[in-house]
C-alpha cells in the first residue's frame, strides 16, 4: 500500500510539477537572445539534481560501508554530480547545434571501456552501477523536458536533438568514477614510492674496540 501511494504521489508530482516546469524553463532560457545561457544553467541544474535521487543516496552509503570508508559517500556524490553536470552540458550543446548523439556516445563508451583495463576492478563495478543509478526518475522527469523545451525554443528536432539525455547521463558517471579510481591508484603508488626505506641495522659501528667477532 505504501509503495502504491508513493508511486501515485511521485507520478502526480512528475506530471503536474516537474515535467511542465522543466519544459517551460527550457523554452524560456533557450528563447532569449543569449540562448547559450542554457549551457551553464543546465550544467548547474544537473550538478544538484543528482543529489535529489534517492537511489544515488543509497548507492553512496552502500559504497562507503562496503569499502570501510575508503570511498566516502561525499567523494562518490561529487563524482556523480560532476558526471551528470557534464552530460547535461553536452546535451545542451546537442540541442543548440544539432550534433548527432553518436559523436558523444561512441567516444564516451570507448573511453570508459578502455580505461577499465587500468582502473581497479572495484571502481569499474561501482562506475557501471552508478551510471544506471544516476539516470533515475529525476532525469527523466525534469532534465529530459528541459532539453525538449530548449529544443522547441531554438527550432530544432525534438526526436533527434532533445532525446538522448538519459543515455548521456548514464554514460558520464562511467568516466568520472573510473577517473576517480585512477587518481586514487596513482596517489597510492606515489605515496609508496616516496615512503622512506627502513634504516639498515648497524653492523660493526656500535661494537667496542676489544670485541671478538666470530666469522
Predicted regions and their residues:
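Transmembrane helix-loop boundary segments of multi-pass membrane transporters
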Residues: 13, 31, 90-113, 126-135, ...
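Membrane-helix cytosolic exit motif
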Residues: 163, 167-192
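Hydrophobic alpha-helical transmembrane segments in multi-pass integral membrane proteins
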Residues: 12-17, 140-157
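Transmembrane alpha-helix boundary signature
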Residues: 10-24, 50-55
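Alpha-helical transmembrane segments
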Residues: 61-69, 116-131, 188
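Hydrophobic alpha-helical segments of multi-pass membrane transport proteins
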Residues: 105-126, 175-181
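Intrinsically disordered, low-complexity non-transmembrane regions of multi-pass membrane transporters
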Residues: 62-70, 182-215
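Helix-loop-helix junctions within the multi-pass membrane cores of secondary transporters/permeases
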Residues: 36-116
